[in-house]
Amino acid sequence: MTSRTDETANATALGYEQARDELIEVVRRLEAGGTTLEESLALWERGEELAKVCRTWLEGARKRLDAALAEEENAGDDSE
């Protein structure tokens, strides 16, 4: 059995697509029902970790896009 810290570390090592796909599977399992309360709580906790990973990836992508757009605007201003 893995510790909670190990699971969190594993989640943060995932790429966006991997985390998103696993999150989709977690949601599917929760919506399907048929799990014990303990299993449901574990799935919910994993889902929260995965959602955080996805959010971090998306925020990083947004920052990179904003930086690239700002750089492009600055380059355009310098050429005038």
Curated annotation (Swiss-Prot):
Keyword Hydrolase: yes
Record flagged with keyword Nuclease: yes
Keyword list, A-Z: Cytoplasm, Exonuclease, Hydrolase, Nuclease
Gene3D superfamilies: Exonuclease VII, small subunit (1.10.287.1040)
Reactions listed under catalytic activity: Exonucleolytic cleavage in either 5'- to 3'- or 3'- to 5'-direction to yield nucleoside 5'-phosphates
Subcellular location: Cytoplasm
Gene Ontology molecular-function annotations: exodeoxyribonuclease VII activity
Enzyme Commission designation: 3.1.11.6
One of the record's GO cellular component terms: exodeoxyribonuclease VII complex
Entry-linked SUPFAM superfamilies: XseB-like
Top-level taxon in the UniProt lineage: Bacteria
Subunit structure, interactors included: Heterooligomer composed of large and small subunits.
Record family assignment: Belongs to the XseB family.
Known function: Bidirectionally degrades single-stranded DNA into large acid-insoluble oligonucleotides, which are then degraded further into small acid-soluble oligonucleotides.
Protein name: Exodeoxyribonuclease 7 small subunit
Organism: Streptomyces avermitilis (strain ATCC 31267 / DSM 46492 / JCM 5070 / NBRC 14893 / NCIMB 12804 / NRRL 8165 / MA-4680)
Gene name, Swiss-Prot/TrEMBL: xseB
